[in-house]
Amino acid sequence: LHDQKLNSVKCENNQMIFTFDIKIFPQDYVGDCYKQYECYKHCDMIVEMKEESFNDYNFVSATDKNGKFEGISLSQAEFVNAINNAYTAEFIDCFANNSELKIELSVNYYNAEKQYRKYRKFSLCSVALYAEKVIWNWY
């Protein structure tokens, strides 16, 4: 999913569903990897979260010339609203540590509507979810 465009995020029935638009090119892959995924146009990353889990949703700015950066922590509802209204959001990475799943997204609010302009200074979204299971649905 590296560099794939995030289309939407929704939360329902204790699941966080990240839907990505898939566009891959043969020159970016080796061996059978391209052939395995070339026919897919979308992917849902479905995270089944633990009951009463403590999840983190953060936006972080790039480091300025003085080595300083800013960050904010959002509620789940604020995160879903903000990420679904980003100018662009792309998958960077995800990794699991025990039951914690960390997801990193590149975000851009360049052409954001007025209420989302406050996010313009942020370039990274970091999400930590306490997950029971992660399902990848390619279609």
What are these regions (language model features)?
Residues 1-139:
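Surface-exposed, interaction-prone regions used to assemble/regulate multi-protein complexes
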